[in-house]
């Protein structure tokens, strides 16, 4: 018992020493360090002493250790080798930390990354997301989020379904996004009070059945009318008229 106490005291001293760093080699090791630090120092703790440069998988990182109240500092994490951030902050309802300097250039999965992060509203426009393929449900139920994302390069995106589902305050212009490789647009802006037309979006990689319920009645009538007409024109001559009519009727979730 005494040896365990001494070990804990030594660990505490090391963690409090600003020059001290620890380098986990796996996600499981990282989760253990996060869990122990939060238990010891609370949900507002500074986790920048963790060298995450060897971590490739951060999927479901906080959800799996049940740290839903976490709102600490992870702004200096080295994410240059991470390829999977799916569900990273899933359910972290209080998290609103600055992660704008993260290196996301190798990430391929961001699905559900901020799922139900109800208070998150931090700038992400400088992120390199050019290799991300899956953005599905990324900001679902991020009620506070309303940051520009117009600089994002979606050249490799395949799935943006429900990306902003129920983002009650989101209203940023995304018309210049490269969506030429996107296969699934379903519910991308559903339950969002959106006002910007998306007439420049390229639908060449999808079909009308993957464009259901794009927006809801909360969107402005002008946005709905202009966008639906532009998209309908892209489908004409490529699909059966019945499919286009179905697309028109299902464009808005009623």
Stretches found by the model and what they are:
Residues 2-254:
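Negatively charged
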